[in-house]
């Protein structure tokens, strides 16, 4: 069926007629829901894959995302703000673009946008970390003393926690770190512990008894757990007889994160400071290749996290990001009184592509993260500093999108862009019915009800990184459903036609969020496009999706298109659309550049 319609693609030279809001002519296509073929560009299957050109090795490197100049990177580790400088530590392979030989890379910044790359902060040079300096955290002790606690692996791959201090705290960059002579300071001792599943310590916090607390990801008697430890001095740790929280229906929890949040207040909270009345806590874990979380309270009497809602089926747990995003780490930014979170976005091309490129992995744009006013979910938004890269703004108002309409967003660099668009629903009467079972696998639903399948309200959204003839394009869009007395919005990022290149992962990512359409008819979408990295924020940050895309058009042609579209029965208005070309940031460039 896919190839049966591929022959139609050559006639769709969109540049010849997509110069206004509407298509002047159509080609009938029953696969497009009988709409006269207006949405053919969304439903026609791409022709056979083609091999990448030699330019692939350079064209997919991002312009304003955090990544080292070369080689492999993965988890963010120990981000902090200290003495006027932001520090980003990260898992790094000095020797190549594949996983292995992991050390702690280290970069510094004054604005979270431009970064200076330094020598690694931690390398594998002691018996307790010879297998790798794995993920960890930074805690700033009283008196302004930062301390790293990280997981090390020994020659037998047993895991334990280690400590390191800055050699010279007067150095603004904190270039050199000294490991504690008594490392490791914490081993997986005790009944029911698994010595090869004991890693990724959190930032520490002080409890009501004045003792430090810390959680470590692990397994306890076969349960996944955020194991809880106490210390008077941050050097000598004692295991608490119960975990901070555990669950018997999931895999081992990596990279746990624990922090306080105030409903409806985007100000950050320092977990070691006095927590105000009404605050909630978030417990995040990396599991099943994604980052999930729970909202609840930290019961000081029990010294335990208590979720507001206990959900046994982990497929229903909330997600930080519904795309290629893992091993996130947050920190309290005392500079601007906010909590910031980073995540690792892996490559989804082939290992041979990574070897050709000479690099693999990046970190998402730093995001402010806070709790929604109803206390049910976390919201995220790119830090305001990233807007300093905006240039060449274009703006449109009062656009009306009927079924099958495209509107081209011109005069911005389609490979490096920031697009903010607001969709206003003329009516909500046409919303299709919601099936609660879709919550178990929103990605599957995005794949089945793609942008080519018309609905009552939606799909509507953006088509990005589109080639001239639309044989390559990525769709980021919404669908609206009615669920009893509320409305559910599905946000999708569909990569299935994103590239003609072979050996790529091209899924359809997706997530649902509740939205009170009786009160507010406007749904916002912000998409940041940075060559092979796309980050989208729907409904004011209710759903976030990070995607990795590798269109051949980027390497072969050097131009692409961005469109707003609607393929639903209900008319959608666009009261405001703004887009900017994004300038290149200075990220871990060659020595000699300095912004400090």
Swiss-Prot record:
Family to which the UniProt record says this protein belongs: Belongs to the glycosyl hydrolase 32 family.
EC number: 3.2.1.153
SMART domains, A to Z: Glyco_32 (SM00640)
Disulfide topology: 446-492
Described function: Hydrolyzes inulin-type beta-(2,1)-fructans. May play a role as a beta-(2,1)-trimmer during graminan biosynthesis.
Domain of life: Eukaryota
GO molecular-function term, one example from the UniProt record: fructan beta-(2,1)-fructosidase activity
Keywords associated with the record: Disulfide bond, Glycoprotein, Glycosidase, Hydrolase, Signal
Record-given protein name: Fructan 1-exohydrolase
Catalytic activity: Hydrolysis of terminal, non-reducing (2->1)-linked beta-D-fructofuranose residues in fructans
Glycosylation sites: 168, 236, 248, 567
Enzyme class: hydrolase
Activity regulation, per record: Inhibited by sucrose.
Record bears the keyword Secreted: no
Active-site residue list: 75
Pfam families per record: Glyco_hydro_32C (PF08244), Glyco_hydro_32N (PF00251)
Keyword Hydrolase set for record: yes
GO biological process: carbohydrate metabolic process
Range of residues in the leader sequence: 1-20
């Amino acid at each position: 069926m896919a190839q049966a319609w591929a022959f139609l693609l050559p006639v769709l030279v969109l540049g010849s007629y997509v110069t206004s809001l509407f298509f002047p002519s159509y080609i009938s296509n029953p696969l497009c829901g009988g709409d006269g073929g207006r949405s053919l560009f969304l439903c026609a299957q791409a022709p056979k894959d083609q091999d990448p050109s030699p330019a692939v090795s350079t064209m997919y490197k991002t312009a304003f995302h955090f990544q080292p100049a070369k080689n492999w990177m993965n988890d963010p580790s120990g981000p902090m703000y200290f003495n006027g400088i932001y520090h980003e530590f990260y898992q790094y392979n000095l020797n190549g673009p594949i996983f292995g030989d992991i050390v702690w890379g280290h970069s510094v910044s004054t604005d979270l946008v431009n970064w200076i790359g330094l020598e690694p902060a931690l390398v594998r040079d002691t018996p307790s970390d010879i297998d790798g300096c794995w993920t960890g955290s930074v805690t700033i002790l009283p008196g302004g003393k930062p301390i790293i606690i990280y997981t090390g692996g020994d020659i037998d791959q047993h895991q334990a926690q280690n400590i390191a201090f800055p050699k010279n705290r007067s150095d603004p960059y904190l270039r050199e770190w000294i490991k504690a002579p008594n490392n490791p300071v914490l081993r997986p001792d005790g009944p029911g512990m698994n010595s090869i599943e004991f890693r990724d310590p959190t930032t520490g916090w002080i409890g009501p008894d004045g003792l430090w607390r810390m959680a470590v990801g692990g397994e306890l008697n076969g349960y996944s757990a955020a194991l809880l430890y106490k210390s008077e001095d941050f050097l000598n740790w004692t295991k608490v007889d119960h975990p901070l929280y555990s669950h018997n229906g999931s895999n081992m929890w990596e990279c746990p994160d624990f922090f306080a949040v105030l409903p409806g207040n985007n100000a950050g909270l320092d977990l070691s400071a006095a927590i105000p009345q009404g605050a909630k806590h978030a417990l995040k874990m990396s599991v099943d290749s994604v980052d999930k979380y729970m909202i609840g309270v930290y019961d000081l009497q029990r010294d335990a996290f208590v979720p507001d809602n206990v959900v046994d089926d982990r497929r229903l747990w909330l997600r930080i990001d519904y795309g290629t995003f893992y091993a996130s780490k947050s920190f309290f930014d005392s500079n601007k009184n906010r909590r910031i979170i980073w995540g690792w976005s892996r490559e989804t091309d082939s290992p041979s592509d990574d070897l050709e490129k000479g690099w693999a992995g990046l970190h998402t744009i730093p995001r402010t993260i806070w709790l929604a006013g109803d206390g049910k979910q976390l919201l995220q938004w790119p830090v305001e500093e990233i807007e300093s890269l905006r240039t060449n703004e274009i703006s449109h108002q009062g656009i009306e999108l009927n079924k099958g309409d495209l509107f081209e967003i011109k005069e911005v660099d389609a490979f490096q862009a920031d697009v903010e668009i607001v969709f206003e629903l003329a009516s909500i009467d046409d919303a299709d019915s919601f099936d609660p079972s879709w919550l178990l696998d929103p990605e599957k639903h995005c794949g089945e009800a793609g942008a080519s399948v018309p609905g009552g309200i939606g799909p509507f959204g953006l088509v990005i990184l589109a080639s001239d003839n639309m044989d390559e394009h990525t769709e980021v869009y919404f669908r609206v459903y009615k669920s009893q007395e509320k409305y559910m919005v599905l946000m999708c990022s569909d990569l299935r036609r994103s590239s003609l290149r072979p050996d790529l992962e091209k899924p359809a990512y997706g997530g649902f969020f509740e939205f009170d359409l009786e009160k507010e008819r406007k749904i916002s979408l912000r998409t940041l496009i940075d060559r092979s990295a796309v980050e989208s924020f729907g409904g004011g940050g209710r759903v976030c999706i990070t995607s990795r895309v590798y269109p051949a058009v980027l390497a072969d042609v050097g131009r692409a298109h961005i469109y707003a579209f609607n393929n639903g029965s209900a008319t959608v208005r666009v009261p405001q659309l703004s887009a900017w070309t994004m300038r290149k940031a200075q990220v871990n460039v060659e020595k000699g550049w300095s912004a400090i």
